Amino acid sequence: INHDPDAILLHRTNHPYTEHLQASVWDVDPVEVCKGRPVGLAWFSPDCKHFSKAKGAALVDRNIRGLAWIVLRWAGTARPRVIMLENVEEFQTWGPVRKGKPVKAKAGQTFLRWKQQLSALGYKIEHKELVAADYGAPTTRKRFVLVARCDGKPIVWPEQTHAPID
């Protein structure tokens, strides 16, 4: 599910047997899309530009900044056994916005509330900051990765496959 036709085209090229929906995530009904089938894994990568330290001085759009709330909709309706979310490390500072700017004194409050609500839906949650290059990706950027499970199985993090050059 993505609103961007270029993103859909790229994904369709790499995953031709996957069903693709070009739509806003807010307009897609998880129950309808899943057609009663169980969901093993749901992956979420909400827009990071409103959290990233590289964003500059642009004003914050609450609708985009709040995209991670869609995770709770899926968790509460389609109930994926495993949920993964990746974003920039600053995602953990998600908090209230006033006059188009994050309220620094309340940094992280929305993130904590969001995690509490996901936990209340029966998910065990763990998150880490990982460097993608340690796992073979051609970037040294640090990424926030969250894994949530509701199937009673442990969360197991992969071992690093690549090491930094000394």
Predicted regions mapped to residue ranges:
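SAM cofactor-binding core of SAM-dependent methyltransferases
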Residues: 1-27
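Active-site flanking residues adjacent to catalytic metal/cofactor-binding acidic residues
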Residues: 1, 23, 44, 85-86
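Class I S-adenosyl-L-methionine
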Residues: 28-41, 48-166
